Amino acid sequence: MTMTLHTKASGMALLHQIQGNELEPLSRPQLKMPLERALSEVYVDSSKPAMFNYPEGAAYEFNAATAPAPVYGQTGIAYGSGSEATAFGSNSLGLFPQLNSVSPSPLMLLHPPPPQLSPFLHPHGQQVPYYLENEPSAYAVRDSGPPAFYRSNSDNRRQSGRERLSSSSEKGSMAMESVKETRYCAVCNDYASGYHYGVWSCEGCKAFFKRSIQGHNDYMCPATNQCTIDKNRRKSCQACRLRKCYEVGMMKGGIRKDRRGGRMLKHKRQRDDLEGRNDMGPSGDMRATNLWPSPLVIKHTKKNSPALSLTADQMVSALLDAEPPLIYSEYDPSRPFSEASMMGLLTNLADRELVHMINWAKRVPGFGDLNLHDQVHLLECAWLEILMIGLIWRSMEHPGKLLFAPNLLLDRNQGKCVEGMVEIFDMLLATSARFRMMDLQGEEFVCLKSIILLNSGVYTFLSSTLKSLEEKDHIHRVLDKITDTLIHLMAKAGLTLQQQHRRLAQLLLILSHIRHMSNKGMEHLYNMKCKNVVPFYDLLLEMLDAHRLHTPVSRMGVSPEEPSQSQLTTTNSTSSHSLQTYYIPSEAESFPNTI
């Protein structure tokens, strides 16, 4: 039996409107819903309200006299929770629910991509209209229920997050690139590829220096040893290029401290952890550490060093036996002195004395127990001080004169022929007079000379680019041994305790003046080298350049750019020797070749 609805005309009109908007009806599976009342009670007259019980048990009222709020918008259809019409579906006839059909779960929601809906709060049982703003129609199926009124697209959020991340990473990479500093080769001013042999250099200069120190290449400059070395002319002269490498500080052992191998870093971390655990007491508190470490906890100490077991008399005897022989100069009395001739005599004499100094240092008790790096480091720092204290000692018996060699005795007036030499002469003469007044003994002299050697490089400058000493503890113990020997000599001479303290302080204070004279002399020698007044021999040149690496640039009287502009002439003399040749032959490969 078919019932005729009173609102059929209005339902047909609404159906034509939907078809005009080209909206396809939703197809849903038909679910059987048991009705609690007869059909006649469901379809009621439009003049009175109708009641219908849904499965949720909620009662809904529809007033046909009042124009119902449209569920369908102009541009789309939306079904959402809280809407009575959308909770159970609508048929093509309008607002009345379709018989024996409910909305399945999950619910289906048709909405624009940005669902800009305008919900209105309402009391329970009242229909809620949804006004879709003027947005293009789109459809999306939502699997979760119940659907929310507004839910942003998670794909859009993820995409925007990826865009923000990529943009931030691009900004970060640009910032890192801006922070990176462009470095140039210290030899030829080309772009540097890294930190090689102690300086920033390019691949070409790195490979050239590597070939030069591995092979025995005797480069000869075809001109005057003044060739310009830059990016375009670095291959024109190998001799000047190698000279430039040494001037800027390239050396065979020059490596960055952070470039050590992973195994070395692992062992260092393990050693540091072990030391940290040893420093912790039983209760977890740090043990109190003394300013001067105890001999029982000193690390890297040569416990079996013969020097530490020597008596004071044995130490003095060993130091006296290690003294180098006297060296005669090439002075010709028939030739008058000039700036070039005097500097030539002094540099030649100093170059030959350096060879004997190396042999003397190896015979100083405790010095031979150090590793090769520390031995070279101490000699490079103290070589001019050792030469000066020897000159002062020889000149004690010649007031007003300096005995450079048995056949070369110079006074202050003769030193005036060399620019800047008079000031150094005066300081040397004053120190010699001080030694003469104190009646310095030969045993005290050899002790002071050894103290200068061992104490020169213990406290390096912070601005030094070279590695500091590795066995400082052993050096300190040998210094203490020699100082005790010096005190023993004073006590043996019959001085009282107060006189011993006073004399020891006076002698050690003189060492600071010798250090000052050494710095003045180093500055003078470097100026002579830059002016090309006299040719410098290989070993002397190597020691001069090495001393400048241990000294801050501000200490020297020249700017750091001068080494690259200096005019240097080297003499390949048979009497000149390199430190690598005469120091320790078995480990000579650890030193770079000189020019």
Swiss-Prot record:
Record's GO cellular component terms: cytoplasm; Golgi apparatus; nucleus; plasma membrane
Annotated Basic residues bias: 260-269
Modified residues (Phosphoserine): 103, 105, 118, 167
Stretch list, region Self-association: 264-595
Record InterPro entries: Est_rcpt/est-rel_rcp, Estr_rcpt, Estr_rcpt_N, NHR-like_dom_sf, Nucl_hrmn_rcpt_lig-bd, Nuclear_hormone_rcpt_NR3, Nuclear_hrmn_rcpt, Oestrogen-typ_rcpt_final_C_dom
Residues that bear Asymmetric dimethylarginine: 260
Chain residues carrying a lipid of type S-palmitoyl cysteine: 447
Family indicated by similarity: Belongs to the nuclear hormone receptor family. NR3 subfamily.
Biased composition (Basic and acidic residues): 154-165
Protein name: Estrogen receptor
GO aspect biological process, one term: positive regulation of DNA-binding transcription factor activity
Residue ranges, compositional bias (Low complexity): 564-578
Free-text note regarding domains: Composed of three domains: a modulating N-terminal domain, a DNA-binding domain and a C-terminal ligand-binding domain. The modulating domain, also known as A/B or AF-1 domain has a ligand-independent transactivation function. The C-terminus contains a ligand-dependent transactivation domain, also known as E/F or AF-2 domain which overlaps with the ligand binding domain. AF-1 and AF-2 activate transcription independently and synergistically and act in a promoter- and cell-specific manner.
Residue ranges occupied by any NR LBD domain in the UniProt entry: 311-547
PROSITE patterns: NR_LBD (PS51843), NUCLEAR_REC_DBD_1 (PS00031), NUCLEAR_REC_DBD_2 (PS51030)
Function statement: Nuclear hormone receptor. The steroid hormones and their receptors are involved in the regulation of eukaryotic gene expression and affect cellular proliferation and differentiation in target tissues. Ligand-dependent nuclear transactivation involves either direct homodimer binding to a palindromic estrogen response element (ERE) sequence or association with other DNA-binding transcription factors, such as AP-1/c-Jun, c-Fos, ATF-2, Sp1 and Sp3, to mediate ERE-independent signaling.
Region (Disordered) residue spans: 143-174, 260-285, 554-578
Subunit structure: Binds DNA as a homodimer. Can form a heterodimer with ESR2. Interacts with coactivator NCOA5. Interacts with PELP1, the interaction is enhanced by 17-beta-estradiol; the interaction increases ESR1 transcriptional activity. Interacts with NCOA7; the interaction is ligand-inducible. Interacts with AKAP13, CUEDC2, HEXIM1, KDM5A, MAP1S, SMARD1, and UBE1C. Interacts with MUC1; the interaction is stimulated by 7 beta-estradiol (E2) and enhances ESR1-mediated transcription. Interacts with DNTTIP2, and UIMC1. Interacts with KMT2D/MLL2. Interacts with ATAD2; the interaction is enhanced by estradiol.
Main localization (coarse): nucleus
Residue ranges, annotated region (Mediates interaction with DNTTIP2): 185-310
SUPFAM superfamilies, per the entry: Glucocorticoid receptor-like (DNA-binding domain) (SSF57716), Nuclear receptor ligand-binding domain (SSF48508)
